[in-house]
Structure formats: C-alpha cells, structure tokens
C-alpha cells in the first residue's frame, strides 16, 4: 500500500538531493560550463531552444522566460524558445506526422549550428525529447540533457549532462529549476552586469 508522505518528509528528501548535488563537483562544474557555453553562444548570435513534456515542458518554458525576460536585473532580452509553446505547430505536427517528431521538426526549421538545445526529461527516455536531441546533434546544435539519476537514453546525445541524483520525479524537477536559475543568473551577470 502506498501512503502519502508528509510535507516534512518531502522537505527532508529535497534537502538530501540538493546536498548530494552540492557535494558533486562534476554536476556543479557542468552547470558552470553550460553557462559559459551559453555566454559564448549569445556573444556569437546563437539562440537557445528548450523542450520537454508535462512538468519538464513547464521547466522549459520557465527557462525561456528567464532568458527572454530577466532574472535578477533589467537587461535586453536573450533569444530563447520553448519548443512546445507554439500550440499550432505542436498539434499540426502531432496530427499530420506523430507526436514523437514535434520538437525535432521545430528544430529543423529554426536551429542552426552554434545554437543550444536543453532537452529536459526526468526519465531521459521521452521519445519526442530523444528525437529532438538526435536532430540537434545532426544540425550541429549543442545538446544539454537535464535528466534524473540514470540519464536514460538521452545521455547518449548529450554534450553536457545534468543528471540529478534522484529517481523521484518531484525532486528531479525541483533540482532542474535550481540549475535553470543558476545558469540563467550566470549568463545574465556575464553578459549584462555593470562593470565596477
């Protein structure tokens, strides 16, 4: 029988996951390197794309908003697009082809070498996200995979991997948001912070 966890138990679990991340130099270095990659890309005129399904789609859209809007201080927008946000494209491609190709087809029409794709999937095995990552690699687009502990099949296509050390979907998604904020803040400060 499955019993509901208390709020206290969930907070203990989320703190434990964040502590594992804090002690994982590889993950923390990956976040810094991803931020540096975005900074270099933006300086060269590149764009950033994100994709995911369900809660990961919400994370993708949140990330795009941090880049096109702002996180810490007012500044010019940065090019970023959550690929699921165009509902007409999504429903047309899903209807006329299949759902697994919705993100890949959007990339084929918009992405170019030097751009970056954030492929977000807690399992690392979402077929639509996998196809997007494969297409991105074929197009010369850098792939950042954001997954759970195993990395799933998505790890095979990743230039950079953020694999949160957990198998709990909620804890993975919470950690993805922390990484999204950390990367966004790093990029924003590097590109727009006033020089002292």
From Swiss-Prot:
Annotated SIS domain residues: 38-196
| Keyword terms, alphabetized | Carbohydrate metabolism, Cytoplasm, Isomerase, Metal-binding, Zinc
Provide the cofactor list for this protein. Zn(2+)
Swiss-Prot/TrEMBL catalytic activity: 2 D-sedoheptulose 7-phosphate = D-glycero-alpha-D-manno-heptose 7-phosphate + D-glycero-beta-D-manno-heptose 7-phosphate
The EC code for this enzyme is: 5.3.1.28
Q: Which PANTHER family match?
A: DNAA INITIATOR-ASSOCIATING PROTEIN DIAA, SEDOHEPTULOSE 7-PHOSPHATE ISOMERASE / DNAA INITIATOR-ASSOCIATING FACTOR FOR REPLICATION INITIATION
Q: Which family does it belong to?
A: Belongs to the SIS family. GmhA subfamily.
The record's HAMAP family line, in alphabetical order, gives: GmhA (MF_00067)
Name it.
Answer: Phosphoheptose isomerase
Organism the protein comes from = Mycobacterium tuberculosis (strain ATCC 25618 / H37Rv)
The encoding gene: gmhA
């Amino acid at each position: 029988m499955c019993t509901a966890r208390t709020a206290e138990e969930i907070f203990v679990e989320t703190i434990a996951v964040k502590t594992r991340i804090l002690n994982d130099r590889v993950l923390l270095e990956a976040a810094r390197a991803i931020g540096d990659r975005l900074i270099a890309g933006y300086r060269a005129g590149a764009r950033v794309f994100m994709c995911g399904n369900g809660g990961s789609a919400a994370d993708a859209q949140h990330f795009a908003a941090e880049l096109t809007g702002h996180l810490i201080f007012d500044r010019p927008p940065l090019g970023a697009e959550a690929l699921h946000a165009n509902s007409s494209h999504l429903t047309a491609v899903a209807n006329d082809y299949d759902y697994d190709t919705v993100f890949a087809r959007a990339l084929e029409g918009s992405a170019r070498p030097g751009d970056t794709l954030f492929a977000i999937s807690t399992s690392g095995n979402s077929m639509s996200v996998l196809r997007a990552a494969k297409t991105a690699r074929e197009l010369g687009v850098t792939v950042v995979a954001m997954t759970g502990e195993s990395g799933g099949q998505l790890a095979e296509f990743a230039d950079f991997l953020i694999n949160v050390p957990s198998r709990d979907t909620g804890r993975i998604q919470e950690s993805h948001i922390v990484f999204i904020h950390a990367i966004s803040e790093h990029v924003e400060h590097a590109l727009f912070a006033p020089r002292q």
